[in-house]
Regions:
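P-loop NTP-binding core
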Residues: 1-254
């Protein structure tokens, strides 16, 4: 079992786009893959046309009454499973606080699934807030991918996430495997090139070699309720996410 969390506190950096298309790229390679939407905005599921009829049919069912994950999985047209989110998820922080039991729920749920399906891969689209939901993801995952658009504010946000991950490492007592992924990259723009240099200086070998270029097809695909591979399989966006998956597999990240 491999669990990958996609996390950033800044909007507009391609967090959900990355989570959806990484999960789709895994499914295309024949891996049994499920995406879990931990963001109360529920954009992961809606991006591919999947919603929860009620809070209990979403990942909220796990937090509310320890419902087994397999009961909430819906199949998408791309071949991956999806556990959608729901607006009820916005209550989780207030209801459950930040004790160990609250932030270990997802980890226990995934381990229970692993007992019966050890080859399953999971991609977590995190809440953009450092709270119960994102901590559940980080405590349960094997690695974190931090997408950041090619601008200075995004780099600053990623540096803050680096501090957060280092603080959590003291609790977990191990290094959190992570990769920083530049999105909306345009090699013609000096800003993009400068931000890449800044990222490499700040995060070193943790920066993905693959860059996700600015691509209109990536913006269009959610409107069609499709992954980039379904909407425009020959587009630059599809090629970039396919290359990213090749890199992550080759590096042993997945």
């Amino acid at each position: 079992m491999t669990v990958i969390a996609v996390f950033n506190q800044k909007g507009g950096v391609g967090k959900t786009t990355t989570a959806v298309n990484l999960a789709a790229a895994l499914a295309r390679r024949g891996f049994q893959t499920t995406g879990i939407d931990l963001d109360p905005q529920a954009q992961f599921g809606s991006t591919v046309g999947i919603t929860a009829a009620s809070g209990d049919d979403s990942i909220y069912g796990l937090f509310q009454r320890n419902r087994p994950l397999r009961e909430m999985i819906q199949k998408s047209s791309s071949g991956m499973g999806i556990i959608p989110s729901h607006v009820e998820m916005s209550k989780v922080d207030a209801l459950y606080g930040k004790g160990y039991n609250a932030i270990n729920k997802l980890n226990l749920g995934l381990k229970a699934e692993n007992a019966g399906s050890p080859d399953q891969h999971w991609v977590l689209d995190c809440s953009p807030v450092v709270g119960v939901l994102s901590l559940n993801a980080i405590f349960a995952c094997d690695g974190v991918i931090v997408p950041m658009s090619a601008d200075y504010l995004s780099i600053k946000g990623a540096m803050q996430i680096q501090k957060t991950l280092k603080a959590l490492e003291l609790v977990l007592k191990h290094r959190i495997n992570r990769r920083y992924l530049l999105t909306r990259f345009d090699a013609r723009r000096r800003l993009s090139r400068n931000v890449l240099l800044m990222a490499e200086k700040e995060f070193g070998a943790d920066v993905c070699r693959t860059l996700i270029s600015e691509n209109v097809s990536l913006a269009e695909s959610p409107l069609m309720n499709k992954t980039i591979f379904e909407h425009s399989p020959t587009s630059r966006g599809a090629k970039d996410y396919d290359a990213l998956m090749n890199e992550l597999i080759a590096d042993g990240f997945i």
